[in-house]
């Protein structure tokens, strides 16, 4: 499938908030809390990108916010619809392009990923993120991997790879 990546609009964010699984518990305990947390996350982000399919429907959001104790490091986040489970190479290629843009603003991207999110960890590793051994995250008490990517360490995409996924 082909996609268009642009800066996210409020309509993209609203659509993705409604598409979130309220039973996942990742962004809160109910639909309202999910939407509120996504909106707060977007508001604190310096970049929010959306991928839209051929019909113009948002299918992924990526964002980055400055780390509170070091504004040169970006705390990266992403949210994707289920269709990318059948198209992991497309999602990996799109993510690589978006993360390269983010690294134009930040010297490093990082976050903590729950060890149970194996596909997310493998996606980030395949793009070039370093995945640290699992450790208990002090803020959440959850076993997480610290993942990070420094500027200059991104997997470059050839024009052929880009044209396969971009409109």
Annotated model-derived regions:
Residues 1-18:
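A short beta-loop-alpha structural element at the N-terminal edge
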Residues 28-47:
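Active-site rim helix/loop that mediates acceptor-substrate recognition in acyltransferases
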Residues 45, 52-53, 153-156, 165-167:
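Charged interaction scaffolds used for protein-protein
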Residues 45-64:
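Conserved beta-hairpin
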Residues 71-85:
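Conserved acetyl-CoA binding element of GNAT-fold acetyltransferases
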Residues 87-101, 122, 126:
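Conserved acetyl-CoA-binding loop-helix of GNAT-fold acetyltransferases
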Residues 109-125, 137-139:
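Conserved beta-strand-loop-alpha-helix junction that forms the acyl-donor binding cleft
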Residues 112, 130-145:
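Conserved catalytic-core motifs of GNAT/GCN5-like acyltransferases
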């Amino acid at each position: 499938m082909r996609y268009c990546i642009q800066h996210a609009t409020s309509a993209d964010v609203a659509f993705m908030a409604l598409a979130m699984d309220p039973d996942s518990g990742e962004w809160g305990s109910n639909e309202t809390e999910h939407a509120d947390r996504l909106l707060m996350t977007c508001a604190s982000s310096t970049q929010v990108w959306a991928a839209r399919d051929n019909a113009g429907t948002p299918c992924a959001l990526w964002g980055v916010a400055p780390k509170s104790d070091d504004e040169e490091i970006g705390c990266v986040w992403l949210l994707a619809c289920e269709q990318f489970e059948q198209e992991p190479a497309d999602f990996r290629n799109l993510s690589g392009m978006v993360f390269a843009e983010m690294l134009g603003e930040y010297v490093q991207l990082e976050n903590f990923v729950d060890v149970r999110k194996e596909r997310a960890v493998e996606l980030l590793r395949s793009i070039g993120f370093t995945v640290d051994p699992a450790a208990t995250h002090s803020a959440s008490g959850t076993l997480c991997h610290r993942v990070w990517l420094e500027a200059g360490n991104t997997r470059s995409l050839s024009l052929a790879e880009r044209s396969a996924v971009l409109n």
